[in-house]
């Protein structure tokens, strides 16, 4: 089998272009005397059908997520409102990664951002949202779980990205 040249680079957004929400989760947990990584544990329990998965696919609203996540966390011994978790999702832009993205594009590679996300409910657009929108506009394609109805690590999510880049 002959090797094919690399034509495209797939990027994640949270934890790559933005700082990881896991850092904010840990600060929240510590400030409330909760076990470390509780939020991640809730998110990892029934990962294809839990509140987090449902929200990322836009199968439930943020209000429904609030109640369902609270119930799921309570089942693990500590009630955490889902609204609190949503407030922790906005990471900081990593300028060095934005420069890396610009370099990849300048070198002729196609790019796609693959992100598990939720529909934004904040109005009006704030400064951070403008910054994120401007970064997203750099990508040739953006695949958002909240818009395509599937999420990482589901194979269909990656298939959509490959179809867009073909």
Q: Where are the language model's segments positioned?
A:
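Short, glycine/charged-enriched secondary-structure capping and boundary segments
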Residues: 23-26, 126-130, 157-159
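Adenine-nucleotide cofactor-binding loop residues
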Residues: 14, 148-149
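Alpha-helix C-capping/helix-to-loop hinge sites
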Residues: 72, 145-146
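N-terminal helical cap/lid subdomain that shapes the substrate entry/recognition surface
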Residues: 3-99, 106-107, 118-122
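Conserved Lys-Pro-Asp/Glu-containing loop-to-beta segment of HAD-superfamily phosphomonoesterases
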Residues: 151-166
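Alpha-helix termination/capping residues and helix-transition junctions
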Residues: 3, 136, 164-166
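Substrate-recognition/cap helix-loop segment adjacent to the acidic, metal-dependent catalytic center
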Residues: 32, 95-144
């Amino acid at each position: 089998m002959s090797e094919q040249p690399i034509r495209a680079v797939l990027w994640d957004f949270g934890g790559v272009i933005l700082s990881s929400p896991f850092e904010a989760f840990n600060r929240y947990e510590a400030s409330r005397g909760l076990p470390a990584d509780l939020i991640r544990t809730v998110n990892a329990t029934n990962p294809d059908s839990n509140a987090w998965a449902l929200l990322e696919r836009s199968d439930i609203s943020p209000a429904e997520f609030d109640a369902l996540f609270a119930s799921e966390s309570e089942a693990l011994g500590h009630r955490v409102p889902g609204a609190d978790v949503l407030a922790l999702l906005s990471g900081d832009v990593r300028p060095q990664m934005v420069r890396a993205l610009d370099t990849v594009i300048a070198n002729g590679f196609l790019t796609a951002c693959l992100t598990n996300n939720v529909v934004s409910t904040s109005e009006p657009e704030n400064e951070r949202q403008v910054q994120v929108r401007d970064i997203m506009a750099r990508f040739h394609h953006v695949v958002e779980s909240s818009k395509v109805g599937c999420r990482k690590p589901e194979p269909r999510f990656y298939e959509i990205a490959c179809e867009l880049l073909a």
